[in-house]
Each structure stands twice: as C-alpha cells, then as structure tokens.
Amino acid sequence: MKQLSILGSTGSIGVSTLEIVAAHPDRFRVSALTAGKNLELLARQIRQFSPRIAAVAAKEDVPRLAQLCDGLEVKIVGGVEGLIEAATADETDMVVAAIVGAAGLVPTAAAIRAGKDIALANKETLVTAGHLFMEMVSSHGVKLYPVDSEHSAIFQSLEGHRSDDISKIILTASGGPFLNTSLEQLAGVTVGDALNHPNWSMGRKITIDSATMMNKGLEVIEARWLFDAPMEKIHINIHPQSIIHSMVEYIDGCVIAQLGMPDMKAPIAYALSYPERVATGIKPLDLTTLTGLTFFKPDLEKFRCLGLAYRAMADGESMPAVMNAANEIAVDAFLEGRIAFLQIARVIEETMDSHIPHDLKSIAEVLQADQWGRDTARDICRRLSN
C-alpha cells in the first residue's frame, strides 16, 4: 500500500490522481491533500479519501475549511508551513507535486529533504531551480518520476538504454488551438479561444501556456534537468494528433516512441505505480483508425514564447526563474483581460531584457529572483493595460 501526499489536489492533475487512487484502493491511500482556493472541492475530497492532514495555501482559509469538514477526523493546516507539513507527513511514501507555478517550490523541496519519492507534475520546479533540485534528489536518495506526458514518454523510451547512446530527445507538441492561426489573427484572439485546446483537458494556466507554446519551452528546460541532456540534443516536433507523446533517437538510427490516447491519467498512473502498471480506464489506441500522423518544426516567429524559453536556458543562472515568473504574471493578466494574447510574449521579453542573470545557490535565492520577475512583469502589465 503506497501512501500519497497530493499537493494541488483540486487542480486538473490532482483530480485525475484521485480518480486513479479511487480505482485502486488496494494499492494507494491518501495521507495528505492540499489546495489553493477551491475549499468546497477539497472538503469533498477529504470526505471521500480520509487524509490525516489537509492544507490550504492561505492561513485565513483554515476556519472555513474546518467548518466544511466538521465532524471529520482530519488535521487542517494552512500557509507555507501547512503545505510543508502535508508534504513531509511521516506516513507518506510519495508526494504528487501538482501545485501550479513557483508556489510548489518550497513544499517539493521539503518533501525531497524528508526522503519522499516525487511524482513531479510541477514543471516550474525544474525550470526555476533544476540544478538545486536534481542535486537534492541525488543527495537524499529519492526517486523522481515525471508526470508530464512528454517526459513520461521519454522516461519510458529511455528504459534499459545507456545515456551515451542517445542521439536526440524529441518532444512532441500539439501546436495548441492556434496552430493554423496566422500571426495577424492572433492579435485578436480571446481568452475563450485560447482555452479551447483541441486535444488535452488541462488547467487554465497550462492551457494558455500551450496556446503560446511556452509550455513546450518549459518542457525543454525540464527535460534538460530530468535527463541530464544538453540543450542541443533536445528537439521539438509539432505533432497535431497528440498520439506519439515523445521519442528518443539513438546513435544507431533507431527511434523509440511512446504512443497512446491523449489522457493525463496514463503518465500519472505510471509515476504512481512504477515499475508496474495499473489499469486507467483510458480508451485503447486503435492504430487501424488513424488516418495519419504528421510532424513539422514549430514556427518561432509566431510562437515567440518558445524562443524566449530557449534564450532563458542559454542565458542560464537566474534567467529561467525570471522568465517563468514573468510568464505566470502575463498569463494571469491575459486571463483577466488586462493584456492581449500577443502581449504575453512582450511582457516576458521586456522582463528578461531588464534582468542581469546571476548564480542561484539556494531555494531562497530562487524565490528572490522569482519575486523580482513578478514585480517587474506586473509593472510592465500595468503600463500595457493603461
């Protein structure tokens, strides 16, 4: 029986994780749940899964959650300290790190220091502090399993092979809702347009990141750290059908890929159950019904955020953390109707142009760089919205 702490249980990944837990009560048990603002859903999850600890991001929400959970045997905590307590619960074997954005850094780091294995859905952890987190994973002897569909595909395609034999890591991308939209048309797209992803059901922030292709840029940086691969070996192919989730090409010319229907339950289940597999209820892939699989290079002129992510990784040091922070602020501003879709890239670029990269030696320094990026991006958003 594997005990799980699920950080971000009310988000898309958290909800899917709990569906897998519910389908396999003989294999998984929930020891802790955490959430941001969706207290009603968190309370329903607590009633169903009976965790010992439940944490909310804001301490002021603790009384409200306690009221919603009246009569239940659960310890309710709040704030960063509460998230850390949930992430480091003694009985927990694995932490599902699914808090969106840089807010997941501190509890994920605490879980690693406490010796917990990690199912990593929070890509910002490695984007902003990849060198620090991979050092912690190594020094504390924990296992890190990717939950992103692309990185799970690479992880599976690498099994049993030597890293020296890798020629290329090929991340696939659907191209998002604007794959066939012209640059001129992008100037007028709405929030509703951007949230209408053709293949995947995801949270709002990651869906916008998919529309700008920043999501793929973050995944390139994440892959660099997860698989200890130089950037020049990591490539992106647009694959609109989202059937091949990623590939690895080896020096002998062979390519190994992972295929499946686009459903996040598959990579989540593999991370939870590795090295075994469990049933997910996903519709099986019927290759005979596929009319074709297509691949082509991304348009960096149209999807400028992708190029900015490559630039951030090339600059290194604090720049990826600043880039990620600026993206979070810009996406929020777009979702709130304060800036236009194409201005997301502008906010990120202007923030990066204002930053001089410097070495980051601790999580505290990463958070300082993150805050600088947020403050700078907010100022730019205010200027653009006036």
From Swiss-Prot:
Range of residues in the leader sequence: none
Substrates-to-products reaction catalysed: 2-C-methyl-D-erythritol 4-phosphate + NADP(+) = 1-deoxy-D-xylulose 5-phosphate + NADPH + H(+)
GO molecular function: 1-deoxy-D-xylulose-5-phosphate reductoisomerase activity; manganese ion binding; NADPH binding
Gene3D superfamilies xrefs: 1.10.1740.10, NAD(P)-binding Rossmann-like Domain
Residues reported in the UniProt entry to bind 1-deoxy-D-xylulose 5-phosphate: 123, 149-150, 174, 197, 210, 215-216, 219
SUPFAM superfamilies: 1-deoxy-D-xylulose-5-phosphate reductoisomerase, C-terminal domain, Glyceraldehyde-3-phosphate dehydrogenase-like, C-terminal domain, NAD(P)-binding Rossmann-fold domains
Positions annotated to bind Mn(2+): 148, 150, 219
InterPro entries per record: DXP_reductoisomerase, DXP_reductoisomerase_C, DXP_reductoisomerase_N, DXPR_C, DXPR_C_sf, NAD(P)-bd_dom_sf
Enzyme type, top EC level: oxidoreductase
Listed cofactors: Mg(2+); Mn(2+)
Pfam families named in the record: DXP_redisom_C (PF08436), DXP_reductoisom (PF02670), DXPR_C (PF13288)
Binding-site positions, NADPH: 10-13, 36-38, 122, 124, 203
Keywords: Isoprene biosynthesis, Manganese, Metal-binding, NADP, Oxidoreductase
Biological or metabolic pathway of the protein: Isoprenoid biosynthesis; isopentenyl diphosphate biosynthesis via DXP pathway; isopentenyl diphosphate from 1-deoxy-D-xylulose 5-phosphate: step 1/6
EC number: 1.1.1.267
GO BP terms, alphabetized: isopentenyl diphosphate biosynthetic process, methylerythritol 4-phosphate pathway involved in terpenoid biosynthetic process
Function: Catalyzes the NADPH-dependent rearrangement and reduction of 1-deoxy-D-xylulose-5-phosphate (DXP) to 2-C-methyl-D-erythritol 4-phosphate (MEP).
PANTHER family per UniProt: 1-DEOXY-D-XYLULOSE 5-PHOSPHATE REDUCTOISOMERASE (PTHR30525), 1-DEOXY-D-XYLULOSE 5-PHOSPHATE REDUCTOISOMERASE, CHLOROPLASTIC (PTHR30525:SF0)
Family: Belongs to the DXR family.
Name recorded for this polypeptide: 1-deoxy-D-xylulose 5-phosphate reductoisomerase
Organism encoding this protein: Pelobacter propionicus (strain DSM 2379 / NBRC 103807 / OttBd1)
